[in-house]
């Protein structure tokens, strides 16, 4: 370890970095050096001599961005030098964001049945499916744009667990390799509803242990029906753009959602309730999993009574769904409300792999624009 520290510092000397703060920089060169050295040790980064200078320069820019964001003190979102601190935002978007959908033109309701229900529904102030044995541990998609597959397995794992009382980790690789006919593209992106269609047509999805993840699009589908870990009979599309609808949907289990995760603030998120004013509610590029919601601090409104509920379900063998989803607006305090969101970037990102995303703040980052959950 001491030798590695010495070699890293020696590289800095060889690059002849001056200990002077250039215009536009927020730290001295020695502060950048110390931070980068500690960061490379923490995340076990090793670079070639030709790559070192570029990664160090990117790290400094990200370090400036983090400090500028956090120093404003007007946000509940806390950024940090996480495992993505040595890549540009362009690299990050190209490598890790694999859901491509425009909520304005999305036709996910085509061929689905719409049920309008006039009813009342009282939801609890918070729910967390992790405490009900319906959420598997954090996974890591690696350098593959397969986020959509992790969102799909996550909601399917939850639905299966709540029905059978058995939590089984399901195979993302099965979806990556085999759901091309449903218009998914492996590591180059896909959609959760397309993956649900595959599971329905395929009459199941394999377990993760039988079909392990490789972070590559396989040339051959290796699905084996003897290794099926779960089946679904349909899925519910939640009313687009309504966070109350999403809250109602979350009463049934984890929900697959698409979000705008393109910003530096999401890339470098560390803790707090995430809110990004620049987020788009329609240009969505990342598939994640809502596993619950809650409120930080005092909630003086209590449970919300919802009306004008609408369900959109997948037509499949005369499926009937008794639950309903609302399209009205929330009346709870907004700034401290959050969604509990499971990501697929390992435990080094965010809050041990999770992010708390703003809830009831005009559908920030499009979290309620395209959302659905499977029926086990």
Curated annotation (Swiss-Prot):
Instruction: Name the residues annotated as catalytic in the UniProt entry.
Output: 147, 286, 343
- Keyword field contains DNA repair: no
As one GO molecular function, the record gives: cysteine-type endopeptidase activity
Q: List the disulfide bonds.
A: 144-187, 178-221, 279-365
Gene Ontology biological process terms, A to Z: immune response; positive regulation of apoptotic signaling pathway; proteolysis involved in protein catabolic process; response to cAMP
Report keywords, A-Z. Disulfide bond, Hydrolase, Lysosome, Protease, Signal, Thiol protease, Zymogen
Instruction: Please give the chief subcellular localization of this protein.
Output: other
In the UniProt record, does the keyword Hydrolase occur?
yes
Positions annotated as propeptide: 19-122
Q: Which residues, if any, are the signal sequence? A: 1-18
Q: What is its EC number?
A: 3.4.22.-
Q: Where in the cell is it found?
A: Lysosome
Choose one Gene Ontology CC annotation of this protein and give it.
Answer: lysosome
Identify which top EC class this enzyme belongs to.
Answer: hydrolase
Q: Which InterPro entries match?
A: Papain-like_cys_pep_sf, Pept_asp_AS, Pept_cys_AS, Pept_his_AS, Peptidase_C1A, Peptidase_C1A_C, Peptidase_C1A_papain-like, Prot_inhib_I29
General function of this protein: Cysteine proteinases 1 and 2 are believed to participate in the breakdown of protein during differentiation of Dictyostelium as a response to starvation.
Family the entry assigns: Belongs to the peptidase C1 family.
Please identify the protein, giving its name as recorded.
Cysteine proteinase 2
- Organism of this sequence: Dictyostelium discoideum
């Amino acid at each position: 370890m001491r030798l590695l520290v010495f070699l890293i510092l020696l590289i800095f000397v060889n690059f002849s970095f001056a200990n002077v703060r250039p215009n536009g920089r927020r730290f001295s060169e020695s502060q950048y050096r110390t931070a980068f050295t500690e960061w490379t040790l923490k995340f076990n980064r090793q670079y070639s001599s030709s790559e070192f200078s570029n990664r160090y320069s990117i790290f400094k820019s990200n370090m400036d961005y983090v400090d500028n964001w956090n120093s404003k003190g007007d946000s509940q979102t806390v950024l940090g030098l996480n495992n993505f601190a040595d890549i540009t935002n362009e690299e990050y978007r190209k490598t890790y964001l694999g859901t491509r959908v425009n909520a304005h033109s999305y036709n996910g309701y085509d061929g689905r049945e719409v049920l309008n229900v006039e009813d009342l529904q009282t939801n609890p102030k918070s729910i967390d499916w992790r405490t009900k044995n319906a959420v598997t541990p954090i996974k890591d998609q690696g350098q593959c744009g397969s986020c959509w597959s992790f969102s799909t397995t996550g909601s399917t794992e939850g639905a299966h667990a709540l029905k059978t009382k058995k939590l089984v980790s399901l195979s993302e690789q099965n979806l990556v390799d085999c759901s091309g006919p449903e218009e998914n593209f492996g590591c180059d992106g896909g959609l959760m509803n397309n993956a649900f269609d595959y599971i329905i047509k395929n009459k199941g999805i394999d377990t993760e242990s039988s079909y392990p993840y490789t972070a590559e699009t396989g040339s051959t589908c290796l699905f084996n029906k003897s290794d099926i870990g779960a089946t679904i009979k349909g899925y519910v599309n939640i009313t687009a753009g309504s966070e109350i609808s999403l809250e109602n949907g979350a009463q049934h289990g984890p929900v697959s959602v698409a979000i705008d995760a393109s910003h530096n603030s999401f890339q470098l998120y560390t803790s707090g309730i995430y809110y990004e004013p620049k987020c788009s509610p329609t240009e969505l590029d990342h598939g994640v999993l809502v596993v619950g919601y809650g409120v930080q601090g005092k909630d003086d409104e209590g449970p919300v009574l919802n009306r004008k509920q609408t369900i959109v379900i997948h037509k499949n063998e005369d499926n009937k769904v008794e639950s309903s989803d609302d399209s009205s607006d929330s009346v709870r305090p907004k700034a401290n409300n959050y969604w509990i969101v499971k990501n697929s970037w390992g435990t080094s990102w965010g809050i041990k792999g999770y992010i708390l995303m703003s809830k009831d703040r005009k559908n920030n980052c499009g979290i309620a624009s395209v959302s659905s959950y499977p029926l086990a």
